[in-house]
Regions:
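Solvent-exposed interhelical
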Residues: 84
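Membrane-anchoring alpha-helices and their flanking helix-loop junctions
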Residues: 1-81, 93-153
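Extended, alpha-helix-rich binding/interface surfaces that flank or overlap catalytic cores
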Residues: 89
């Protein structure tokens, strides 16, 4: 299934899964989060996920390298500072956190696989191909970075 590698932008996958999560949210069973404060959990996750994604994008812009997930070969510099000291993929992490918050807001058991499916898809069809390209482009420097910083957290 290599033909899916680097084909669909992760934000589109997140939106599609979010719509799917919403679509199945009326199916039982439902769960009660923190005495019906699921909206607060969702808000914290959405703001947190958005902030993580924003900080990651700002860091890449400051380094004057590509923000396009479909073109990792256009990367001009290996960014290992800022939020990239803790996660090699903070933009995808932010989307996963936001999807998790949306699942909490929906309070529907059938929406829970959404964030998991996002992580599985992005790991296989986005991150692994990116890692191959970055390894070829930056060699030992990238290999050292991967040993020091985890893929997600």
């Amino acid at each position: 299934m290599r033909w899916l590698e680097l084909r669909i932008p992760p934000r589109f996958i997140a939106v599609a899964l979010g719509l799917g999560m919403f679509g199945v949210s009326s199916i039982e069973p439902r769960f009660d989060l923190a005495l019906s404060h699921h909206w607060a959990t969702a808000l914290v996750a959405a703001v947190g996920g958005g902030a993580i994604t924003f900080v990651a994008a700002t860091t890449l812009r400051a380094a004057r390298t590509t923000l396009l997930p479909m073109r990792p070969q256009n990367t001009t510099s290996l960014v290992t500072t800022g939020i990239y000291r803790w996660s090699r993929n903070p933009m995808y992490l932010g989307l996963a956190v936001a999807l998790t918050g949306f699942a909490a807001y929906l309070s529907a058991a059938w929406s829970l696989p959404g964030p998991v499916l996002f992580i599985l898809y992005v790991n296989r069809f986005q991150i692994r191909p990116e890692e191959r390209i970055l390894s070829e482009r930056f060699g030992a420097e990238y290999e050292t970075y991967t040993r020091r910083v985890r893929r997600w957290l």
